[in-house]
Amino acid sequence: MKTKLLFFLCSLLLVSCQDDEKFQVLRPLGGQVISGYQPCTSLDLGILSLEALEVKDGGDWTVVSSDEAVVKAEKVIPEGASYSYLSVYPLKQGKAVVTVSSEKGDKIYIPVTVGTSVRTLDVWSGELNHIEGVSKEDSLLIVEHLYDDVFLRKGGYYRLTYSEKKKGKLTVCTPDGKMEEGTFVCDYEYYDLTFDGKNIHYMVMYSETGFQEVTRTEYRIPFYLVEDVTDRYRADYPTIKLVQRAQKVRLAAND
């Protein structure tokens, strides 16, 4: 009886070890700190996503995407490194299949669906103003006018639903719950927001006392949206040089 039990346990251990050495594509679990891995059998990604997957026991493996207009898949070997990983990068909404082939000829097929991505810009502070070229008294008048003209104050948010890499649907919510719908176009250095008959061009300004880093969960440190409204005041204040207003925001991922 003891001999049979020992043989059974040894068999389980052997099967387990063989399974560990199986050709697999693994997806990291967790956020900034990886807590483990699980086999990757399919991917549902937002248009802004980027996946780095581990290929285990594939030898000199290769990868190909069935539709490179939808998903780019490539083997990445960091400079000076002795390891590689699989990068899956969505380019537009749609579906594709990523095929990973081991050195021995085994294949793993990973269906990939690419949809929208959602990001929220939460307003963290009241408006900050920078005015040059007028007297202190005139500056106070301009600040008062700017305050009355602000649409979004602390506690409000801009919700960005990306249908493409740099554009999509905009939802604006004020602290008292007023909602506006519109569209946006953006890049690393700006946001162009169109809603309620308005078109606002925000420049992006990062804090000098910090750094901007995208993590696996894509939470970022606060930064500023800066709007240049100098032209509004040139007629009334001929000497004016600059009028800028800024809002401190934080960007968070919702998908």
Where are these regions (language model features)?
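Sec-dependent signal peptide recognition
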Residues: K2-F8
